Amino acid sequence: MSNAKHYDGLDREEIDSRRREYGTNVLTPAAKESLLKRFLGKFKDPLIVVLCVAGAASLGISFYEYFGLHLGGTVFFEPVGILMAILLATGIGFWLEVKADREFAILNQVNDDQPVQVIRSGQVAQVPRRDVVVGDIVFINTGDEIPADGLLLEGVSINVDESSLTGEPICHKTTDPALFDSDATYPSNRLMRGTKVMEGHGVMEITAVGDRTENGKVFTAAQIDNSVKTPLDRQLVGLGKMISRASYCIAALIVIGRIAMFLTSVEFDWITFTTFFLQTIMIAVTLIVVAVPEGLPMAVTLSLAFSMRRMLKTNNLVRKMHACETMGATTVICTDKTGTLTQNRMQVYKTDFFGNIPDNVIYEGIALNSTAQLDKIEDKLTVLGNPTEGALLLWLLERGVDYSALREKCKVAEEIPFSTERKYMASVVECDGRKTLYVKGAPEIVYGMCQDKSGTTKEQVDLLLANYQNQAMRTLGFAYKEIEDSSQVIVDNTISIGGLVFLGIAAISDPVRADVPAAVEEVRNAGITVKIVTGDTPGTAKEIGRQINLWNDATDSQDNIITGTEFEALNDKDLLQRVRDIKIIARARPMDKKRLVEALQTLGEVVAVTGDGTNDAPALKAAQVGLSMGDGTSVAKEASDITIIDNSFASIGRAVMWGRSLYRNIQRFILFQTTVNIVACLIVLCGAFMGLQSPLTVTQMLWVNLIMDTFAAMALASLPPSEKVMNDKPRSQSDFIINSSMWKFILGTGLLFFAVLIVLLYYFEHTDLTSLQQIGSLTVGEFKGLSPYELSLFFTIFVFLQFWNMFNARAFATGKSAFHFKGCSGFVCIALVIALGQILIVNCGGEFFNVVPIRLDDWIIIILSTSIVVWIGELLRLIAKS
């Protein structure tokens, strides 16, 4: 509000007193389910129910064997193993969910830190929304979210969207009791927390904060919606179903095969058969637990959460989880100019005022026909509000004019707020007994409203504008009129009188960000099309395009640039024919951006769009990824998926790189997990037919599951992003997550591992091997089963084959060596945990893991011989690279 400075606001003592009495402006989150209740919820899983039933039966048999047959305490190892299976299957998923919740918790508190303009101790200041207290005097402008409940003190054309509270999209707010709407849910001078200013500006006094607001009374913890089903989600569901069906079939074959083997090779005894049948069911169920990728969704969530946290360090605040991976599939970026491509550091480059107009008229017009403020923080002036208007206030200060003194001295009687449709704003000012109308806006609009052209011609003004615009400068036109009588000047947000006098033009520069040309080139090399959508003139927009190497005068033509008016005139058919060729839309309006997004989507493009204003919300919601700016309005941020904190286009390029790298990391995890699935399922299936004893016990398979689901997810999710992904073209949405090269790797590696392990299994079952050095020297004889030492060898060889294969999975599609560890400290640490864990299990696990300690020379043989897996991978990568 131009003359709102006469409010003193609260002082420091009053602020502290109000905060103690009325509390802070933060909503208390709704109570969540307790951790215990969430953990118990995991036991509703059908697989866990089967494990619980099997565990109870196993415990009953163990009690019978211990008390009835006096077989000793070792009989309880099986039920303890089942208990471990249950705790692992439930505990890991529970832990990952809690971890993911903590990763996302910060995102749901971001709004409490949104800046709010207040008057305190007679000075305009900016404070976080959480610090607003009862009694604060708050400025509100178009696009703002009301920070707390309060009363409107002054307002100009204020319309508020109360749909989040009452369902009413537009409610007019006023301080005039004669204009109050008797049918409104809340009085017309009351403003409610969480509602949004769609038009106008004003001043309000806070009357309630936090839980005492109307919004707080009906508040339920509003979490970010991460339920959007993306192509990746659908592919993962399909992959999970495919693996699940295969594992169920293999489990059924194991049960049938082992029962058939028992009935044909052992004299039937009910107690023995019951024990054997229970063991068979346990093997089948455990195989399902291992094979079914119940950890896959959580592993993806962990990867997303990990990426979200690290993307924040590159100025990308991800609000909606799916946007992480969708950015990697983006094919078109529709970007604003101001603040995104440019520095948004507006400064008046030059002014051209015509005629013999007194300076005080120009100064009054700039100071009073404005909603911007200047805030002095540590001797540095900061613009609060529109940066273009702020540049004009700074220009006044350079000339020794105190804009705040003018606002104290004069009164704004009527106003028309700026809108993208009108492209101008106007104020009727009463000062020193004079009444003056001031108009400011797009020069061509303002000039057309003037009767007195101050000795200029349209051609002269157009030439002047073209000169500035060709230097990528923003231009504003100014006009005024002295009002002689008391007639109403503004009617229905329209100037009702004529005879305006043209004052002149101000050219305002906003340099291109230094890192933007390289960032634009990077995303274009990545196969992504960049389009500029701006409210500036064609000349200004084209010059910015030249500076960032998007526009080339030698190759581009009028087919590649269009104005908002021309864009609107295109029918849908013509638009679809032209839309891919359009590089720049100048003088664009908000709905032009939304229509552009929808047209591109119709052609199968994946669109990311930037926006910072309230009117950008439709386009931000329509795009696959909406990118709001850090200093954008609350409405824009709420409609977006990612907030670019520093407003820079370079950060958008970083988001694309993260999205593509994230997708690759998920592919690597699936590559590793699916290979282990194939090997484990085939080994257990064949083992059931080759002998009565399963080569992998319940507890051993659960360790494999821990490696496969949790450790591998953590290791591969922690891999840093790769710059090389920006050399690839965007992936097609229809591409299955397991591509042909992955299938070759999975099937080739899986079948090779199976062949090696099944030969070893057969050899172990038909010899009395006591050291791996005996391989080749012992004669294969009759079936003898597996000794504890042979079981330990087989289990360790199986694990270390997967261990080395994890290095191959990590190096997949990177073009780098599996031993390139720069930036991969997390991967190295987890690999060491797996290796040390296996050594401890074999040496200390005893009967619980059904293992015995392995000789040192056998450890060396296993580690060296299984490492051939990674050396073969290195050789294949070297061949592919050359």
Model-identified regions with their sequence ranges:
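Conserved cytosolic headpiece of P-type ATPases
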Residues: 1-730, 735-738, 795, 812-882
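Membrane-helix interface motif
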Residues: 260-267, 758-775, 843-846
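Alpha-helix capping/termination and helix-coil
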Residues: 604, 656, 660, 755-767, ...
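Core segments of transmembrane alpha-helices
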Residues: 676-680, 745-757, 833
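Helix-coil boundary and interhelical linker segments in multi-pass alpha-helical membrane proteins
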Residues: 688-697, 763-789
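Generic alpha-helical transmembrane segments
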Residues: 708, 753, 789-806, 831
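Membrane-water interface at loop-to-transmembrane-helix junctions
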Residues: 732-752, 781-793, 821
